[in-house]
UniProtKB/Swiss-Prot annotation:
Protein's name in the database: Histidine--tRNA ligase
Gene name of the encoded protein: hisS
One MF annotation (Gene Ontology) recorded for this entry: ATP binding
Alphabetical keyword list: Aminoacyl-tRNA synthetase, ATP-binding, Cytoplasm, Ligase, Nucleotide-binding, Protein biosynthesis
Matching PANTHER family: HISTIDINE--TRNA LIGASE (PTHR11476:SF7), HISTIDYL-TRNA SYNTHETASE (PTHR11476)
Catalysed reactions, as listed in the record: tRNA(His) + L-histidine + ATP = L-histidyl-tRNA(His) + AMP + diphosphate + H(+)
Length: 494
C-alpha cells in the first residue's frame, strides 16, 4: 500500500527566491546600516519602522478580477474581505504614514527607514523575492535645498561605510529639463497631458537602454525602431531625425564644469518654461553643494542619468561606484549603481487630494555590501568567541565562572555545551566556531590554580607551516594563573 502522504516529513528547504542569512552576513549588514544610520541621524533624520503588512489600497495596487492582488506583491484577503500585502518598498508605507499622521508630524518631516521588502517576481540568479532597502526622505519641502541635502548625505554615507572619494560619484539630473528638451523638439504637447505622458514614456524607455544598447541602439529606438541580433524588431518612438538628435544632445550635454553643463542645457531647452525651471534647479543644487564643500569630485550634474526619469517629478540622483571588478567571466567592468533617488511631489496626494512635495534616496543594501567586500572592507573571516572547554562535568560552576569573567570584560565567550567526553571533539567545535582561544582546566590545573590557553589561530598557522623561530617566539599553548585569565586572554587576542 502506498505510504500515507499525510505522514511524509516536510522538506527542509528555502522557498524559491528567498535565502537565509548566517553569522557574518548579518553582522556585516548591521554594522554597515548602523554607520549609515549615524550619518542620517547627524542630518536630523528620525528613524521610522512601519509594519511589514499594508493594505493593498495603501500600497497603490489594484485588484483585478482574480483571486489575488496584482502581480508584484505577496497579498491575501483577510476575514473581513480586505486585501493585505507585504510591502514591496519603503516609500509606499511612508506615503501612508505622512497622510495618516499629517497633523502630528513636523513639516518638513525627515525620516529614514531600513528593512526587508518583498516582491512577487520571478526569481533568478542574484534576483530575490526578499531583499533589504535603506531609504531616507524629506516630506513637505519644495525647496531644492532638500534635494541638495539628500545628495550630500548620500555622499557622506558612502564614505563612512568605506567607499573612498574617487571610487564613487553622485550624479544629478532633472526630469523637467528632459521634458523641456522634448517640448522644444516638438515631441511633447503640454496642452494634452495624456498624450504628453504617453509620448514621454516611449522616449524614456528608449533612452533608459543607453547602458545596454549604446548610443546607436538608443538612436534607432528613438526613430523607426531597432532589430536585434536575433532578428527581432522593436518598434521605436517614431521621432524625426531632427527630434531624435535633440534628445541625444540632451544625454550628451555634460561638460567639464557644472556651469558649462548648465549653459549647454539652457541652449537645449530654449524657451521652454519647464525646461528653464529645471536648469535653474540644477544650478541651485550645484551652488548649495559647493557651499558645503561637495565639489564635482563627489557630486556632479550629469544629464546622462536617465534611470528614474519616468517616476520622479524633478531632480533625480544616482550613486555610481567607479572602481573596476571582475565579472563572472573574468572581464573587467565598473561596479555600477548602488543608490538612486529623486523628487516625487505626488507622494501623499492620492490619500489627501493635496500635493505634498517630497524627495528621497534608496540605497541597495545588498549591492553596497557586495561593493564593500570587493574593496576588502567587508567579507573578512569573522573571529568567533573564546571557547571554555569542559574537562570535568562536576565543575560546571567553575567553567561558567570563567565564561562570566570573560564576558564582563567585554570579550565574546561561550561554554562548550556538547558531550564533554571526547576532548578532541571540543577542539573541533572551537575550530568550527573560528574561536581564537580555547580555555582548558582539568583537575590537575585546578589544584595548581592555573588554566591552559590554547592559541588556535597560531596553532593553525603552525599547522600551515610557520617557521620554528615563529613557534618559539610565541608558543601556541601557555599556562597562566587562574586569577590572570582575563588579562592573559586579552593579551593573546591582541
Amino acid at each position: 500500500m502506498a505510504k500515507d502522504k499525510a505522514s511524509r516529513r516536510p522538506r527542509a528547504e528555502t522557498p524559491k527566491g528567498f535565502r537565509d542569512y548566517f553569522g557574518a552576513d548579518v553582522t556585516e549588514r548591521k554594522a554597515m546600516l548602523d554607520a549609515v544610520a549615524e550619518v542620517y541621524h547627524r542630518y536630523g533624520f528620525d528613524p521610522l519602522e512601519t509594519s511589514a503588512v499594508e493594505t493593498v489600497e495603501a500600497l497603490g495596487k489594484f485588484l483585478p478580477d482574480v483571486d489575488r492582488p496584482n502581480e508584484g506583491v505577496f497579498g491575501w484577503q483577510d476575514e473581513d474581505g480586505d486585501w493585505l500585502a507585504l510591502r514591496y518598498d519603503l516609500t509606499a508605507p511612508l506615503a501612508r504614514v505622512a497622510a495618516q499622521f499629517r497633523n502630528d508630524l513636523p513639516s518638513p518631516y525627515r525620516r529614514y527607514a531600513m528593512g526587508p521588502v518583498w516582491r512577487n517576481e520571478k526569481p533568478g540568479p542574484g534576483r530575490f523575492r526578499q531583499f533589504y532597502q535603506c531609504d531616507a526622505d524629506t516630506v513637505g519641502s519644495a525647496s531644492v535645498a532638500a534635494d541638495a541635502e539628500i545628495c550630500a548625505m548620500l555622499s557622506d554615507a558612502l564614505e563612512v561605510v568605506g567607499i573612498p572619494r574617487g571610487d564613487y560619484i553622485v550624479r544629478v539630473n532633472n526630469r523637467k529639463v528632459l521634458n523641456g528638451v522634448m517640448e522644444v523638439a516638438g515631441v511633447l504637447d503640454p496642452s494634452d497631458p495624456a498624450k504628453f505622458e504617453a509620448e514621454r514614456g516611449i522616449v524614456l524607455r528608449a533612452i533608459d537602454k543607453i547602458d545596454r544598447l549604446g548610443k546607436t541602439g538608443v538612436r534607432a529606438l528613438l526613430g523607426a525602431g531597432r532589430k536585434d541580433e536575433s532578428g527581432d524588431f522593436t518598434k521605436g518612438a517614431g521621432l524625426s531625425d531632427e527630434q531624435a538628435e535633440v534628445v541625444m544632445g540632451f544625454m550628451a550635454a555634460k561638460r567639464d564644469t557644472g556651469a558649462a553643463t548648465a549653459a549647454r542645457l539652457r541652449e537645449l531647452v530654449g524657451a521652454s518654461t519647464l525646461g528653464c525651471e529645471g536648469v535653474q534647479e540644477l544650478e541651485t543644487i550645484a551652488e548649495l553643494l559647493d557651499a558645503q564643500g561637495y565639489g564635482p569630485d563627489r557630486i556632479v550634474v550629469d544629464p546622462s542619468v536617465v534611470r528614474g526619469l519616468g517616476y520622479y517629478t524633478g531632480p533625480v540622483f544616482e550613486a555610481e561606484l567607479t572602481f573596476e571588478i571582475l565579472d563572472e567571466k573574468g572581464r573587467k567592468r565598473q561596479f555600477g549603481s548602488v543608490a538612486g533617488g529623486g523628487r516625487y511631489d505626488d507622494l501623499v496626494k492620492r490619500f489627501t487630494g493635496q500635493s505634498v512635495p517630497a524627495t528621497g534616496v534608496s540605497i541597495g543594501v545588498d549591492r553596497l555590501l557586495a561593493a564593500l567586500r570587493a574593496k576588502g572592507r567587508a567579507g573578512a573571516e569573522a573571529q568567533g568567541p573564546v571557547v571554555v572547554t569542559v574537562m570535568d562535568r562536576d565543575r560546571m560552576g567553575d567553567y561558567m565562572a570563567m565564561v562570566g569573567e570573560l564576558r564582563r570584560a567585554g570579550l565574546r565567550a561561550e561554554l562548550y555545551l556538547g558531550n564533554p567526553k571526547n576532548f578532541g571533539n571540543q577542539l573541533k567545535y572551537a575550530d568550527a566556531r573560528k574561536s581564537p582561544v580555547a580555555v582548558i582546566q582539568g583537575s590537575d590545573e585546578a589544584t595548581r590554580g592555573v588554566v591552559v590557553l590554547k592559541d588556535l589561530v597560531l596553532g593553525a598557522q603552525i599547522a600551515a607551516g610557520a617557521s620554528l623561530e615563529e613557534w618559539k617566539s610565541r608558543p601556541a599553548q601557555v599556562e597562566v594563573p587562574r586569577a590572570d585569565l582575563v588579562r592573559a586572554v586579552q593579551d593573546m587576542l591582541s
